[in-house]
Amino acid sequence: AVAKLLAAADVTAALEGCKADDSFNHKVFFQKTGLAKKSNEELEAIFKILDQDKSGFIEDEELELFLQNFSAGARTLTKTETETFLKAGDSDGDGKIGVDEFQKLVKA
């Protein structure tokens, strides 16, 4: 799981900060969890966990379940949050986020 690569207290704090629907902000989440400080290699390992169907991309269905990769009991992202997250990360406009796009998004 992703949580093994991050400090538990940081993950808990980040999840607490986005419990309410439409309160998820990927930049804040990446900062609070410590993801923003990870190396590209570590981010690639995390990407592979998030890419649940192993397609080489994170699609909207996987983004919707994003928080559950950090804690099984976390909520799903709303449609608005998922669309905003996808738009922020999908720099080539193909409707999904590749590993390079994910690394850039986390470090942005």
From Swiss-Prot:
InterPro entries: EF-hand-dom_pair, EF_Hand_1_Ca_BS, EF_hand_dom, Parvalbumin. Keywords: Acetylation, Calcium, Metal-binding, Muscle protein, Repeat. The keyword Glycoprotein does not apply. Residues 38-73, 77-108 form the EF-hand domain. Transmembrane segments: none annotated. Coiled coil: none annotated. GO terms for cellular component: cytoplasm. GO terms for molecular function: calcium ion binding. It comes from the Eukaryota. Pfam families: EF-hand_7. The modification N-acetylalanine is found at residue 1. Ca(2+) 2 binds at residues 90, 92, 94, 96, 101. The keyword DNA-binding does not apply. PROSITE patterns: EF_HAND_1, EF_HAND_2. Ca(2+) 1 binds at residues 51, 53, 55, 57, 59, 62. In muscle, parvalbumin is thought to be involved in relaxation after contraction. It binds two calcium ions. Belongs to the parvalbumin family. This is the predominant parvalbumin in latimeria muscle. PANTHER family: PARVALBUMIN, PARVALBUMIN ALPHA. This is Parvalbumin beta.
